[in-house]
């Protein structure tokens, strides 16, 4: 039984891994309205309007079918969709550093919760997992620093000098580790 459960979880992870870049393209390259993406998530039988939607649904439909916790999965995906929509503010010049931090935490935190929803395990410390996702998004922003700077996308990474970034990221890691330590 354990091996079968593991196999199903692995299949879901692989499907989401294929789905994620297509999902990003719906936002970033296609400028698909959030309402349309929500429709695709809520109603997987929706007919696609273009090749990106077709590819999205090719991965999403079997993933959704394989989900044991469909309601939790959909809830996480809808929260991530809100966070993705909110991240468009990163292209607005007067968006505050605090708002950028909040956007980054939401994207990363919701992504981590979505990934965990693929597993059949019970989540015992949502806050710690959310913080871990935020740290992962901070790292992603560090790796994407050059591309984000060229695109005029405001991130924590391109809004701080190196010393400030080290301090910020170190503090975020300590807070995340502390959140997990409280669980055990």
Language-model segments: residues:
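Amphipathic alpha-helical scaffolding segments
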Residues: 11-18, 31-42
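Divalent-cation-assisted or electrostatically stabilized phosphate/pyrophosphate-binding catalytic cores
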Residues: 35-62, 95-106, 150-182
């Amino acid at each position: 039984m354990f091996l079968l459960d593991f196999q199903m979880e692995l299949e879901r992870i692989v499907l989401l891994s294929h789905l994620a870049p297509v999902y990003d393209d719906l936002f970033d390259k296609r400028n698909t309205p959030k309402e349309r993406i929500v429709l695709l998530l809520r109603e997987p039988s929706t007919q696609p309007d273009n090749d990106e939607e077709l590819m999205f649904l090719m991965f999403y439909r079997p993933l959704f079918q394989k989900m044991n916790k469909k309601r939790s999965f959909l809830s996480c995906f809808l929260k991530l969709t809100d966070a993705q929509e909110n991240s468009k503010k990163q292209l607005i010049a007067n968006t505050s550093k605090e708002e950028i931090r909040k956007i980054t935490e939401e994207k990363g935190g919701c992504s981590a919760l979505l990934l965990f929803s693929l597993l059949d395990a019970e989540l015992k410390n949502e806050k710690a997992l959310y913080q871990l996702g935020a740290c992962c998004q901070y790292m992603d922003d560090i790796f994407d620093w050059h591309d984000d700077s060229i695109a005029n996308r405001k991130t924590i990474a391109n809004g701080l000098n190196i010393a400030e970034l080290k301090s910020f990221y170190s503090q975020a890691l300590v807070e995340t580790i502390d959140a997990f330590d409280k669980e055990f």
